[in-house]
Amino acid sequence: GRYLATGRFRDGGWSGMGPALFAYRPWVDASGTPAAPGTHLEAVPLLLYESSQASEDIVRSLVGYQHPDEWEGGVWVTTAAGKTAVLFAGTKGIGDKYWYGYVNPAGPEYPCVDQDFVGQFTVCRLADGSPCPASDLTECSGHNDYRGWWSSAFAAQFILYDPADLADVAAGTLDAWEPQPYAVLNVDDYLLDNPAGIEIDLLGSGAQRHYRLGAVAYDDANGLLYVLELFADEAKPVVHVWQIQS
């Protein structure tokens, strides 16, 4: 058995168009012999969507995927009644359009692409993944210097997967890009939302505020889910706690 799991997420789809999860073990045999320093541990992908480096199209992705998505932490949740789920927390792009470039001073509904990259890749897309009209492929005036992937709106979300789907991936009966969340929870109403106004140019504001959630942890014995809200106490995070019911 592989008792540990790890993963990563990078905006732009470099690590896959959705969260990634790999199962592994830190020992090399049935006796529990630790791996030697520098050993490459074998890992089994449980969740791995298509990479943007392999496909320019939004395919084999998380449903509703956008390039500005941010998935920062994940946990295996088990309730007192024995129900289980794999939960990821992050800041999800949910806007009608998303683009590579800058925040547009005219408003979140207006893209502001980096003109230098127009023609190199699809710098602006609609929510369904199709390209934006040509009228959106212009760099606005008066923007700041914080270039990256932006959506016209973000939401702080938990997404929950059925562990049975991930087990099917490990068994080879599902492809690693096939599992999808069975539930999505928007938790923005519980957040402080950068009350000190730290790094507005970097973080965005209002509907375009990203970097909302950070790492997560789960207290299995007491059913407590701990989630970091980033930039909630000036530059420091605040820990939110949810009681998971059975």
Model-assigned labels for residue ranges:
Residues 1-246:
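Sequence/structural signature of beta-propeller domains
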